[in-house]
Amino acid sequence: MTENPFHYLVETLSGTSDKTFFNVSKLKATEYDSLPYCIRVVLEAVVRNCDGVLVKEQDAFNILNWKTKCEFKEIPFLPARVMLQDFTGIPAMVDFAAMRDAISKFGKDPKQVNPACPTDLIADHSLQLDFTKCIAAQNVSGLPAVETHRPTTTPGKTPGRKAQCRSQGGCKGACDLGAANGSSREQIENTPMLCPFHLQPIAEPETALKSLEIEFNRNKERLQFFKWCSKAFQNVAVIPPETGTVHQVNLEFLSRVVMEEKGCIYPDSVLGTDSHTTMVNGLGILGLGVGGIESEAAMLGVPITLTLPEVVGCELTGTINPIATSIDVVLSITKHLKQAGVAGTFVEFFGNGVSQLSVADRTTIANMCPEYGATVAFFPVDSVTLQHLKQTGVDLQCVKTFENYLKAVKLLRQENVQQPLYSKVLQINLNSIVPYVSGPKRPQDRISVMDMKKDFETCLKEKTGLKGFQIPEEKQNIMVPVTYGNSEYSLSHGCVVIAAVTSCTNNCNPSVMLTAGLLAKKAVEAGLTVKPYIKTSLSPGSGTVTYYLSASGVLPYLSKLGFDIIGYGCARCVGNTNPLPESIVTAIKEGELVACGVFSGNKHFEGNRCSCVCANYLASPPLVVAYALAGTVNIDLQTEPLGENAQGKKIFLQDIWPSREEVLEVEETLVIPSMFSELKLKIEKQNTRWNLLDAPESTLFPWDLRSTYIRSPPFFHKLEKIPPPIQPIERAYVLLYLGDSVTTDHMSPAGSIPRTSPAAKYLMQKNLVPREFNSYGARRGNDAVMTRGTFANMKLFNKLVGKTGPKTIHLPSGQTMDVFDAAELYQRSEIPLIIIAGKKYGLGNSRDWAAKGPFLLGVRVVIAESYEKIHKDHLVGMGIAPLQFLSGENAETLGLSGKEQYSLSLPVDLTPGHKVEIKTNTGKIFHVIAAFDNEAEVTLYKHGGILSYVARKYL
């Protein structure tokens, strides 16, 4: 291996004898001191990983000259670790398992095949709300202390006991708690509910346990594979369900701030397969949300490519308003940055206001980074960060080592040192921030709580659009009577029917959650209640939240108002929710009401919750509770009461809102090192379901040929020890002739599997019925399903066919058929395929199967006017050549019909930007550009893609 050209920067850390580091601050001190902190982290990674092949010496100097090279230079980046959630983790780990098989066939030790960096896989996105619970407690003052240990009863088999259901008579008699066990099949089929408010009447604390039991049963096959991965591979850790959301677990348990490998210490950084991986930016860790292929590349030791970004400095000044929560700060910053236009940039926070924000506040702000369009929202490590590490149980000597290292490489933010230079600077005065909500259709549409009533009434009148609902004037004050249980209610525009404290965005923040809990306590003590038809829930980011809500004594009060813990994964945050009561839905539809949902999550786009709830608002957890108490968003919380108690006394929000001092006192008492260490111990030792789950004890995975979820992919079937020379493509047919702005969702849809699709036909051949199809996203570990789903989007427009639909023409026969069926016929005849497209080919979310699928269909070349860069990189990563029409040319100007046959040759000495000649069987000749950006991409292409490139290293 080539010696690292920066080896002269290696030093021993002061105060230690066995810890070394690359002192990048000495590379070019003047230039280094002017770099933003987030760029310094990138520079350190390039210096440490410089091998002269995939990471070159010049890359480091390009970063040092960041201000002049910005947006013009691409640099390689290898993270300290990779984080996967279950949906994206499946295909990545399936590829690793298949690579082991391939290595074994060459007589090599398959145990060599392991991720090149620590990889954590968190199974959190499969949680669905199969159960919520009936409120058994009627007198909160008499409730016993809430236990944090697991019940000793068998999951799902609680002793039956009678208690009044919160539906107030909607059940057929009193709920027989725990009597009905249900099954995963019954829940999947969405059978009628025994109780209008619940899918099953079930007692707390069994609510979360019951949903988790079904989660394990529903996903048993995938979980068994994950468990095998955790045993078979080095550098792989699996965090099972029942733990928390991917980002909360990352923050509480996986983040290191400073990493160590073989005595070398370096900054923590992470690539995660979710846009909200940025949450750990609040802890001073560079976290980037990427797609499946980028994360898999990093796991394989191949760097991803970053364009040197603009870095926007966001200066926070002033002090936080006493009644404003961190969520108010988040929403204010979201709107400010959205308006300032920071899309695609790195945002770095500085100024005297930063020190007023706790790590929980910072991570909440960083979590919302994708909502204002930035790639990164970075808070450099400072004294607040170090104090947080001590508070959460990190060994004090480790914290001291971290501090010494970060000071040595100038990664510790201090007030008395030179400020970095930024591309531009924005200022936000924290004094000006007051409580806000966001909605009713987009997260960037922020409304002051004081203006909420006026704004909602305006939305009713405005034309249908970004905010308006265009309700006729004569219908704006309509009242719809509804019977729910044994009581009569009236619904009107603005009625709240869903109120959910959910998602990692808020649940990580003790002050915000404790404010909600203390507000609930004061509300109950004041005699307020929540109307029983409102679907309320509490979905904590992790068990940490349960711990401090329980220990503070507020959990019973939240439960009294209906905010019951229903599980620890992504539930209502990703739309996994059970339906509203039928009578409420009917009333909403009959009255054409603008019904509302209030959430403390990070997204609320239209249609993401319930179809009959057309106004959705993001709010802080205490405001979610407040609006649930009011029962409407059409209220002035300053001047109108939330409700009346049994004595007829009007109760206003200011009567029950806890002071910042109250919240701080509880937070300082509870957020202690033992809390985090206890939860870490629970994860490691006490997950009974995971511990009892059977998994193979083998180096190679024993593939089950009957499985419809996990299948060995064919990516290595033609693997040779030496990569064969680039072969000419002769007489290729066009599989698809596409236009502009073809998205990755057109290429590989992630939603439900249509009954008439090739994927459905395959699953039916496996004796599955439509209700068992699940989604393309859930079956990413089965290449047979995903290949059949490639270009199966109903909105695809193929010019060969001339109309919308997932069809193409098999040109030799002239027959119109499904894209997969045509590709299969071509492959049987060993005919290569190409795709012709227009501008911006590959728009949309990063999606691994948008490149893997075309490769398995037999596509070897894409010719487009322009590409979305990430997707183009994915094509290269799968061994598909991205070719680009010359400027001013496209298929139409060249007179191409798409029905020709195409022949071309890429030279052995292929270079980025090489001009390639293409001939058609009609005699037409034209030229295109080989759209490779650098020599590393050419190398990967010559190997047939990333997977083959890495596999050959083991041969």
UniProtKB/Swiss-Prot annotation:
InterPro entries per UniProt: AcnA_IRP_Swivel, Acnase/IPM_dHydase_lsu_aba_1/3, Acoase/IPM_deHydtase_lsu_aba, Aconitase/3IPM_dehydase_swvl, Aconitase/IRP2, Aconitase_4Fe-4S_BS, Aconitase_4Fe-4S_dom, AconitaseA/IPMdHydase_ssu_swvl
Subcellular location as annotated: Cytoplasm
GO terms under biological process: intracellular iron ion homeostasis
Gene Ontology CC terms: cytosol
Gene3D superfamilies: 6.10.190.10, Aconitase, domain 3, Aconitase, domain 4
GO molecular function: 4 iron, 4 sulfur cluster binding; aconitate hydratase activity; iron-responsive element binding; metal ion binding
Keyword Endoplasmic reticulum applies: no
Binding site for [4Fe-4S] cluster: 504, 570, 573
Co-factor remark: Binds 1 [4Fe-4S] cluster per subunit. [4Fe-4S]-binding affects RNA-binding activity, thereby inhibiting activity of the protein.
Major localization listed first in the record, in broad terms: cytoplasm
Cofactors that this protein relies on: [4Fe-4S] cluster
Maturation and modification: Ubiquitinated and degraded by the proteasome in presence of high level of iron and oxygen.
Keyword terms, alphabetized: 4Fe-4S, Cytoplasm, Iron, Iron-sulfur, Metal-binding, Phosphoprotein, RNA-binding, Ubl conjugation
Protein family per UniProt: Belongs to the aconitase/IPM isomerase family.
Reported function: RNA-binding protein that binds to iron-responsive elements (IRES), which are stem-loop structures found in the 5'-UTR of ferritin, and delta aminolevulinic acid synthase mRNAs, and in the 3'-UTR of transferrin receptor mRNA. Binding to the IRE element in ferritin results in the repression of its mRNA translation. Binding of the protein to the transferrin receptor mRNA inhibits the degradation of this otherwise rapidly degraded mRNA.
Protein name per Swiss-Prot or TrEMBL: Iron-responsive element-binding protein 2
Organism annotation: Xenopus laevis (African clawed frog)
